[in-house]
Curated annotation (Swiss-Prot):
EC number: 2.1.1.-
Keyword Transferase: yes
Keywords annotated in UniProt: Methyltransferase, S-adenosyl-L-methionine, Transferase
Species this chain originates from: Aspergillus niger (strain ATCC MYA-4892 / CBS 513.88 / FGSC A1513)
Stored InterPro entries: COMT-like, O_MeTrfase_dom, SAM-dependent_MTases_sf
Protein name in the entry: O-methyltransferase aunE
Keyword ATP-binding: no
Gene Ontology molecular functions: O-methyltransferase activity
Catalytic residue positions: 299 (proton acceptor)
Function of the molecule: O-methyltransferase; part of the gene cluster that mediates the biosynthesis of aurasperone B, a dimeric gamma-naphthopyrone. The first step in the biosynthesis of aurasperone B is the production of gamma-naphthopyrone precursor YWA1 by the non-reducing polyketide synthase albA, via condensation of one acetyl-CoA starter unit with 6 malonyl-CoA units.
Pathway in which the depicted protein is active: Secondary metabolite biosynthesis
Length: 386
């Protein structure tokens, strides 16, 4: 039965509308980040119009593409306006990233200040509203064209399908990271990974709070036997946090950063080692380490690729070795990142049961696990001894 014509929109309808119309507004986030609109608004320090923000931007950065001008015909007059900044600031206000005041005036709020004070968060926002939004736009098209072939496999996701349909045949065969490298986006992504959207404390603090006895593990091991291998460790922030917490135990030779990311650069405080675990013939080069770490690595991988990587680590683990995995707890709070991993990487966040299945396929068993309602879970695996 149709609702009466004069009936107000029900709360459920408002919820649906406000949620599904987010995507177009999110498309403006990269503009705000690219032109540092959050930083400009915060530095102004008081309510400001879009023109005020543009003027401040010009003073700080000089002439940029922000100043492309639109001429609007209004009756018999032409008005010169900058619609890019005005619409972008308005939509950032709609998303809650700044405050909307009457008469097209904008003001920094707590979210604005967080974005300015946490540069990695702005780079993360750019990533999910660029690569992530592109992939989501082509999800249904990819499914329909393949008769709903699912789950996706690595390098064959809606992200690659988007590039295929746009005529970028070379990029359509590449991994997301390779595409970001070729398009100049990888350095931004690496910056995101150093701090993400903010973290509580250091890695030792976080695992300690969840009940994992990292202190006891390191202190009960002879110094000459301590080696920590961070697989896919980016710019080494996890190892550097461990070094700062245990300076008497962890020196450069104890800390091994394994990466194949082309834009990482030099991390002088740790031992850098290239390892592309994607290559079938490339085995884990460090045997018998005390601790192998994977932080936000496996959620980028499909189950098949995860098992391959876990097997490579399992084969070189000693009976005393630990594999420590840190990912988001899979629940409603992480459902959006779960979707992002599926669409861009064919990966996923995982539950305890899913981690146990992966471990079993790789000859490993879970010996510690903790799943907080928000933030990172911690899963320790050890080799199954026959």
């Amino acid at each position: 039965m149709a609702a009466p014509q004069n009936a107000p929109i029900p709360e459920a309808g408002k919820k649906v509308m406000s949620t599904v119309t987010l995507a177009p507004a999110l498309g403006f986030v990269p503009i705000a980040v690219h032109f540092d609109l959050f930083g400009c608004l915060q530095e102004i320090g008081k309510p400001a119009t879009a023109q005020d923000v543009c003027n401040f931007h010009h003073t700080k950065y000089g002439d940029t593409d922000l100043f492309s001008i639109t001429f609007l015909h209004n009756k018999s007059m032409f008005a010169k306006v900058n619609r890019t900044s005005d619409d972008t600031l308005f939509l950032m206000g709609g998303l809650g990233f700044l405050d909307l005041l009457p008469d097209d005036v904008y003001q920094a709020n707590a979210v604005t200040r967080f974005l300015v004070d946490t540069p990695s968060a702005q780079h993360g926002a750019m990533h999910f509203t660029s690569e992530g939004l592109l992939a989501s736009a082509f999800l249904m098209r990819r499914l329909m064209d393949t008769k709903f072939e699912y789950p996706f496999q690595e390098c064959d996701t809606p992200f690659q399908y988007a590039h295929k349909l746009m005529g970028n045949d070379h990029l359509a065969r590449e991994h997301v990271y390779s595409v970001m490298h070729e398009t100049g986006r990888l350095d931004s992504f690496n910056t995101f990974m150093t701090g993400k959207f903010g973290r509580w404390g250091t890695m030792p603090d976080r695992v300690r709070k969840l009940g994992y006895d990292l202190d006891g593990l390191l202190q009960s091991t002879a110094p000459e036997r301590i080696r920590v291998v961070d697989i896919g460790g980016g710019r080494g922030e996890l190892l550097l946090e461990m070094q700062a917490t245990y300076p008497h135990l962890l020196k450069k030779e104890n800390l091994i950063l394994q990466e194949y990311n082309a834009d990482i650069g030099v991390v002088p405080e740790v031992t850098e080692m290239g390892w592309n675990y994607k290559e079938d013939a490339s085995e884990q080069p460090v045997k018998g380490a005390l601790l192998y770490s994977m932080a936000h690595v496996l959620h980028n991988l499909s189950d098949i690729e995860s098992i391959k990587l876990l097997n490579k680590v399992s084969r070189v683990m000693a009976p005393s070795s630990r594999l420590l995995i840190q990912e988001f707890t899979k629940n409603a709070a992480s459902s959006t990142t779960h979707a992002a991993m599926i669409l861009m990487h064919a990966g996923r966040e995982r539950t305890s049961a899913e981690w146990r299945d992966l471990a079993a396929f790789a000859g490993l068993e879970i010996t510690f696990e903790a799943y907080p309602p928000n933030g990172e879970c911690v899963v320790e695996m050890r080799k199954v001894l026959n």
